[in-house]
Amino acid sequence: MKTAMTAESTLYDAQTIRERVRAAGVVGAGGAGFPAHVKLQAQVDTFLVNAAECEPMLKVDQQLMAVQAERLIRGVQYAMTATGARAGIIALKEKYQRAINALTPLLPAGIRLHILPDVYPAGDEVLTIWMATGRRVPPAALPVSVGVVVNNVQTVLNITRAVEQQYPVTRRTLTVNGAVARPITLTVPIGMSLREVLALAGGATVDDPGFINGGPMMGGLITSLDTPVSKTTGGLLVLPKSHALIQRRMQDERTVLSVAKTVCEQCRLCTDLCPRHLIGHELSPHLLVRAVNYQQAATPQLLLTALTCSECNVCESVACPVGISPMRINRMLKRELRALNHRYEGPLNPEDEMAKYRLIPVKRLITKLGLSDWYHDAPLTETDYPTDKTTLLLRQHIGASAIPCVLQGEHVVRGQCVADVPSGALGAPVHASIDGIVSEITEQSITVIRG
């Protein structure tokens, strides 16, 4: 098995791999949607699969690895060929035993598993690199600066399909969890509405639900269930609207700043538990809270450190004893600093000797977040769920929006490119996820009706 898989991966050269990944519209499925073909242009010594899936309510990657182990390993080999990497690492948690058992007998030379503890935020790209390789990415730098390219499980599986079948990204696997009748992990057409996705899980079980796109720590508030599934939709979390996780996300920025100025006690727990600070970054959330509260404390260099915040939300959801959100403050600062084209430059300090002991055990995190009553297994189903309407966002990735290459009224088939980015621009094409008629084209999306 190992020999056959290794031989198959040698059928394609680096340029072919990158071209097919680009044509298929593969983007980072676990983050902001960085185009995968651009990452594969880097030349590094290590390709790392971030399979930690540290958000406690999401159950996608851990289950996909168990049932698609061969495809995942072939994808790692294609990525290694494209990047020139000599080493491939799949970093996953010890508790993912089904995945470990499926992957271990298939590992070829040059690819290994790295077992992670069940802590948050082990799935943060920079933290995963540190835990799996011992290398520390400097603040404001990319993983390539330390010789590593990182993708998550679903991205690597999409790379395999793109290379072997020239199959574009038209489906997304996501978890529906929390206050739903049937917690589930399922694969749906890109562009299906979250309203339909919720119905597939049996609907909400509370009278006045709130919704989060993604996990409880980093996911954003959903204001409309008509929002379509995109290439980066990680999950649909349903909770009572009265739940603290929903209420915090509903706070406006003025309230966030007012709370910070009123109750901050300068205990510095937010900094002591900040994962980026622990590995040597200059970022100190308590000093940034102080800076927005008291102008005389706001030096230019201090404010710029906000640009290095990963928005992992440890400071707000775990560290702060009085309900302040340093993360939201950092997000505001980042928006203003980026609007002025400011960039951060600063040192990589020695890592904290207590760093590995200050990451948050996920069991404790679930309790701290008030999720014990809403935490479910959400088993994976391989059912193909159809839909009669898809709304395909033209910007499901970092970079320029895709430009429609079809006309209203045109018949399209699943897998057909309906929008692409200009040559040389950062971005990724968008493909039809169902057969149908283009019913509407706007600046933001293309709507396809089955027919």
UniProtKB/Swiss-Prot annotation:
Family assignment from sequence similarity: Belongs to the PduS cobalamin reductase family.
Gene that specifies this protein: pduS
Positions with a binding annotation for [4Fe-4S] cluster 1: 264, 267, 270, 274
Top-level taxonomy: Bacteria, Pseudomonadati, Pseudomonadota, Gammaproteobacteria, Enterobacterales
Protein residues bound to [4Fe-4S] cluster 2: 309, 312, 315, 320
Protein name (Swiss-Prot/TrEMBL): Cobalamin reductase PduS
Effect seen on changing residue 312 to A: Colorless protein, no 4Fe-4S centers, no cobalamin reductase activity
Keywords per UniProt: 4Fe-4S, Bacterial microcompartment, Electron transport, Flavoprotein, FMN, Iron, Iron-sulfur, Metal-binding, NAD, Repeat, Transport
Organism: Citrobacter freundii
Cofactor note: Binds 2 [4Fe-4S] clusters. The two centers are coupled but must possess different redox potentials.
One family name in Pfam for this protein: SLBB
